[in-house]
Each structure stands twice: as structure tokens, then as C-alpha cells.
């Protein structure tokens, strides 16, 4: 027991024995100084880094908070726009339904209007054809002119003829429809009215716009196009030319002489026949011819008229020969 206790005591003293290192005093002082400096500066450095990290953390937290707010705002905006989109889509669907309903109503209205227009055209064609037939009577013409709708009738006549010619769109074929019959009947009525002295006087004094329209339409129609209407309009002008005032008005219209020569190029013999008659009206009236003699002679399509004087169409041949004879007489008198 005694030996064991002594050994244990010896071991305890050995474990607690201090160890020493030999260091030069100078090194110890330098080490001591450095330790003091570290002890002095380390808290400052650590405190600065911690503070900086803390500030950065604050900034990050603020940014995160702002981002969260922005995200929340974006969510609210998204919900708002989604609601607006749904509203717009609903409005769009409603508008489409309304437009579809309106389109159906418009189509129905167009169909009704078309039916009414067809009915009016049929009625106009029938009524004007009947009036065309009876207007060959002087008494009927006087009755027409004596009414308070005569001016309106001839104004509408000119407008209707003009619209019809514009609608042809280059078609050179004769049209066989209620619309064309309506227009032909109107032109025929004008021709018959102009065939009566009081009718010519009325047209020259009160319906010059109609005469201007006829001259314009004769220039608008191409050679071979709608010859029946051309013939009726030329007959109207010829009848008006029987009236000296009417002949003066027509012949003084701008481009009248070139129009006559252009119309003579039409392939239809009936058109050329009535052009020659109108030319003859100008030639046989000295007061009128003297004003356009220079232009007349310088542009006269003599070869075309000579060819017509040898035509197989007896009426065209006779008219051309008479015009050539009248021209020779004029040259002889000059």
C-alpha cells in the first residue's frame, strides 16, 4: 500500500510539471508588442467587418423586402389585368354577336333594297316604255311639258343615263334587261319631245344640262358600245338642231367637232347615219357653220365619208353622198 501510493504521487507531480522554452529577451519583447497590437487592433477589424456585414445584410433584407413588395404588386397587377382581359373578352364576344346580328340585318336590308330597286326598275321600264310610245303625239308632249314635274323628269333622265353608262364597265354588247330598257325608253322620250317644236324649245331653254350630259355620254361610250342608246341620243341632238338656238348651243359645246369625227369611227352603220345627219345640220346653217368652218375643214375625215358614200347600207350611202354634195356646194360658193 505504501509503495503504490508513492508511485501515484510521483506520477501526479510529473503531470503538473511546467515546461519552459528559452527565448531571447529581444524576441520576447517583439512578440509581446505584436500580441499587444493584435489584441488592440483585432477587435476593431472584427467589429468593422461585422458592422459592414451587418449593413450589407440590412441592405439585402431591404432589397428582399422591396422585391417581395414588387412581386406582390405584380401579382395584384396580374390579377387586375386578368380581370380586365376577361372583361374585354366578354365585351368582344358581345360585340361579335352584335356585329353578326347587324350584318344579318344589313344583308336583309340590302336584299330588300335590291328587290325594291328591281321592282322600281321593272316599273320604270314598263312605265317609260309606255310613255315613249305615246310621246310621239304632240298633245302628249305638250301635256308632259305642261306639268310641274317636267324639269325634274328631264333632270332625273340625265342622271339615270349617266349612271347607266358608267355601269357598263367596258361592255360593248347590247344589254337586254329592265335597266337598259328603262334607259332606252328615257332616251326615246327625250327624242320624241325634241321632235316637237315646243319640246325643242323647252330643252334648249330649260334642260341644257341634259343636252350637255348627252354630249358627254356620246364621248364616253366606246365605238360599238351600246349603239341603241347612241342612236337615240344622236336622234335627240339632231331634233334639237332643227331649232336654230339649239343648233348654236350644241355646236358651241367644247369639243363638238372632234366628237362628231370620233363618232364616225363607230362600226355601227346606224350610229354613223345619225352623225352624218347632225353634221349636215351644221353645214346647212351658214351662221353656225361660219364659226367652226376652219376647224371643220382642217379635221374633216373625208376618206371615211367617201367610204360611207359607197356603203351597202342605202340610207348611210345616201346620207354620205348628200353631205359630200353639200360640202362641194360650200366650197364652190367660197
From Swiss-Prot:
The keyword Cell membrane appears for this protein: no
Coiled-coil spans in chain: 49-122
Origin organism lineage: Eukaryota, Metazoa, Chordata, Craniata, Vertebrata
Compartment(s): Cytoplasm; Chromosome
Reported function: Meiotic recombination factor component of recombination bridges involved in meiotic double-strand break repair. Modulates the localization of recombinases DMC1:RAD51 to meiotic double-strand break (DSB) sites through the interaction with BRCA2 and its recruitment during meiotic recombination. Indispensable for the DSB repair, homologous synapsis, and crossover formation that are needed for progression past metaphase I, is essential for spermatogenesis and male fertility. Required for proper recombinase recruitment in female meiosis.
Protein name: Heat shock factor 2-binding protein
Residue ranges of the region described as Interaction with BRCA2: 83-334
Disease named in the record: Premature ovarian failure 19: A form of premature ovarian failure, an ovarian disorder defined as the cessation of ovarian function under the age of 40 years. It is characterized by oligomenorrhea or amenorrhea, in the presence of elevated levels of serum gonadotropins and low estradiol. POF19 is an autosomal recessive form characterized by irregular menstrual cycles and cessation of menstruation in the third decade of life.
InterPro entries, per database record: ARM-like, ARM-type_fold, HSF2BP
Ranges for region Interaction with BRME1: 14-51
Record note on modification: Sumoylated by UBE2I in response to MEKK1-mediated stimuli.
Known partners and oligomeric status: Associates with HSF2. The interaction seems to occur between the trimerization domain of HSF2 and the N-terminal hydrophilic region of HSF2BP. Interacts (via C-terminus) with BNC1. Interacts (via N-terminus) with BRCA2 and BRME1; the interactions are direct and allow the formation of a ternary complex. The complex BRME1:HSF2BP:BRCA2 interacts with SPATA22, MEIOB and RAD51.
This protein's GO CC annotations: chromosome; cytosol; nucleoplasm
Tissue spec: Testis specific. Overexpressed in some tumors.
Keywords, alphabetical: Chromosome, Coiled coil, Cytoplasm, Disease variant, Premature ovarian failure, Ubl conjugation
GO terms of biological process kind: double-strand break repair involved in meiotic recombination; female meiosis I; male meiosis I; spermatogenesis; transcription by RNA polymerase II
Species for this entry: Homo sapiens (Human)
Amino acid at each position: 500500500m505504501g509503495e503504490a501510493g508513492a508511485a501515484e504521487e510521483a506520477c501526479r507531480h510529473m503531470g503538473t510539471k511546467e515546461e519552459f522554452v528559452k527565448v531571447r529577451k529581444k524576441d520576447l519583447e517583439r512578440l509581446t508588442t505584436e500580441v499587444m497590437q493584435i489584441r488592440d487592433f483585432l477587435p476593431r477589424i472584427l467589429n468593422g467587418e461585422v458592422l459592414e456585414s451587418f449593413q450589407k445584410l440590412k441592405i439585402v433584407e431591404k432589397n428582399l423586402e422591396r422585391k417581395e413588395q414588387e412581386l406582390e404588386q405584380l401579382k395584384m397587377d396580374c390579377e387586375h389585368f386578368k380581370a380586365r382581359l376577361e372583361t374585354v373578352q366578354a365585351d368582344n364576344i358581345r360585340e361579335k354577336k352584335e356585329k353578326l346580328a347587324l350584318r344579318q340585318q344589313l344583308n336583309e336590308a340590302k336584299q330588300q333594297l335590291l328587290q325594291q330597286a328591281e321592282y322600281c326598275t321593272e316599273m320604270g321600264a314598263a312605265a317609260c316604255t309606255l310613255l315613249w310610245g305615246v310621246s310621239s303625239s304632240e298633245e302628249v308632249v305638250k301635256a308632259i311639258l305642261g306639268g310641274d314635274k317636267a324639269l325634274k323628269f328631264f333632270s332625273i333622265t340625265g342622271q339615270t343615263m349617266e349612271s347607266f353608262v358608267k355601269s357598263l364597265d367596258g361592255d360593248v354588247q347590247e344589254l337586254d334587261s329592265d335597266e337598259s330598257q328603262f334607259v332606252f325608253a328615257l332616251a326615246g322620250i327625250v327624242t320624241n319631245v325634241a321632235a316637237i317644236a315646243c319640246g325643242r324649245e323647252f330643252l334648249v331653254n330649260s334642260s341644257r344640262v341634259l343636252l350637255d350630259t348627252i354630249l358627254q355620254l356620246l364621248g364616253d361610250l366606246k365605238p360599238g358600245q351600246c349603239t341603241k342608246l347612241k342612236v337615240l341620243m344622236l336622234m335627240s341632238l339632231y331634233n334639237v338642231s332643227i331649232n336654230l338656238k339649239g343648233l348654236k348651243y350644241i355646236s358651241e359645246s367644247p369639243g363638238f367637232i372632234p366628237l362628231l369625227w370620233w363618232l364616225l369611227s363607230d362600226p355601227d352603220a346606224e350610229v354613223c347615219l345619225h352623225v352624218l345627219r347632225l353634221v349636215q345640220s351644221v353645214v346647212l346653217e351658214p351662221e353656225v357653220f361660219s364659226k367652226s368652218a376652219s376647224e371643220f375643214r382642217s379635221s374633216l375625215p373625208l376618206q371615211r365619208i367617201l367610204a360611207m358614200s359607197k356603203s351597202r347600207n342605202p340610207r348611210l350611202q345616201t346620207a354620205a353622198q348628200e353631205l359630200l354634195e353639200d360640202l362641194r356646194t360650200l366650197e364652190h360658193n367660197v
